[in-house]
Amino acid sequence: MSASTPVSSGHERDSADLAGFGYQQELKRSLGTFSSFAVAFSYISPSTGIFTLFALGLTTLGGVFIWTWPVVALGQFLVALNFAEVSSHYPVAGSVFQWTKYLSSRSYSWFTGWIYLFAGILTVTAVVATLPLALIPALNGLGWDSLDSGSLGTNEVVALITLAVITVLNIYGVRLVAIINNTGVLFEILGMFVFAIVLMAFHNHQGFHVVTNSAGFHVGPSSFLAAMFMSLFVIYGFDTASTLAEETRDPRRAAPKAVLFSVIGAFIIGGVFLLGVLVAIPNMHTAVTGAFNPATIIEANFSSSFATIYLLVVSAAIFVCCLSIMAATIRLCFGMSRDNQLPFSKPLAKVAPSLHTPVWTCIAVAVLAAVPFLKYSGAGIIAIAATGMIYLSYFLGNIVIMRARARGWPKITAPFRLGRWGIVVNVVALLYGGSMLINFAWPRAASNPKPAQTGGLLSFGIGFVNKIPILWTVVVVIAAIGAIYYFAAGRRKDFAVVTAPAPDDPLPAAGPVPQVEN
């Protein structure tokens, strides 16, 4: 009996902490620190981003593009430090939306949450569209020779099946997701690291000086910024550890650790994997002209059976990434709906008593993530649009945190704190984030093309829209839809819990958080 006391008291403490924010403990609190880290690391998933946009970096700067990796990792680590401190103060589902809610005006918070929600939904689309890049060659290696890896139709079918599967798994609960995540993270870390070492030891065709081989491309600020997009697509989503705070034990301590270690782990594992793939390129000229992705390079170096095993490991890692991103987006949608801030908030905020999951939110996120497949143009274009919106959300969040710091926040001590370094970290993170936003928005065929520049892959059917960079169109449309809803109905809604607790459950104290600092 005594052995269970710490667990019980810990659960009661976490539930009481959540009640202080005006929320009832409905989601099942079953994640430890490693599981929290695993979910955040799975969201980042170096293998997923590298498989999606490796060809973009290679065809822009050759092997030199690997130097974009530490630059982006450092910039994102500064953002992560900022987020880690805030997550220690506000351990509730919704990350950037919740932080801006407590530190800024209502309108600012709502639009930040709206943009971040659709950035997450687009990211779900992008990662399920990435899985076929590794899975189809792996299935072909197992004898499914009829699958055409170059067919957008085949890729689309595999992506939609993946979306359906991860939706069902998320409906059945965070504990199941955590078990799969924990296993998948170990596979990804060991698989990427071990296979990279094998590539460097036994298939080192280029030599380590490949990192200085630009393959004849001019190395300058413009080309370096364009080559950054693979790295930019990988290292984000670390705030997922905070998004799942209501399902994490002792989240004020666990979430900040998971946020930071997920970035560090992704930087190390992803960097080693990138180097291994680059040195294993049989012929740089052929790889550049053929826009090789990692699957092609792996198949060129290993026997069919060995390459198939490796691609299956990578496919598993990407699948876990899909699962994690879906889980994080569902929690954000749930957090906003619980506060009565979205259309159909009541059903979206309803938690199934037996599953402890918001079932309708899971379904809604899946349906919205499927919409881009109506005009499917490949994983790369969706990935760039999704990443640009994520960085916009992060930048909006960092602005609010900086404003709060200027007014004396934090005034209350939390387990993780930056102290006097907080303002310095925040300022540099804003400078980095702002420069990356300009980079995302800059119109260029490689990273923010107009539909007319996609070679027929994408057309909106409206002449002048096809001449506007894709990211601009996506942001404007999503912001416009949000503005129409907010000013027509949303702004008249209070931040209020819209689902009543079960009859036998105590009603938590309503109102603002006792430790809210403005």
Listing of model-derived features with the role each one plays in the protein:
Residues 98-100, 105, 136-144, 258-323, ...:
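TM-loop-TM module centered on a large, flexible mid-protein loop between adjacent transmembrane helices
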Residues 48-149, 262-268, 272, 471-478:
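Extracellular loop-to-transmembrane helix junctions
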Residues 92, 115-130, 235, 239-248, ...:
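Membrane-helix boundary/coupling elements in multi-pass transport proteins
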Residues 154-205, 259-264, 383-397, 421-432, ...:
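Membrane-interface loop-to-helix entry segments
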Residues 1-54, 58-64, 77-81, 212, ...:
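Membrane-interface "cap" regions at the ends of multi-pass membrane proteins
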Residues 98-101, 128-157, 191, 245-265, ...:
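Helix-loop-helix connectors at the membrane interface of multi-pass transporters/channels
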Residues 380-390, 420-518:
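A generic transmembrane alpha-helix motif of multi-pass inner-membrane proteins
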Residues 65-66, 142-156, 182-308, 457:
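Helix-loop-helix junctions that connect adjacent transmembrane segments
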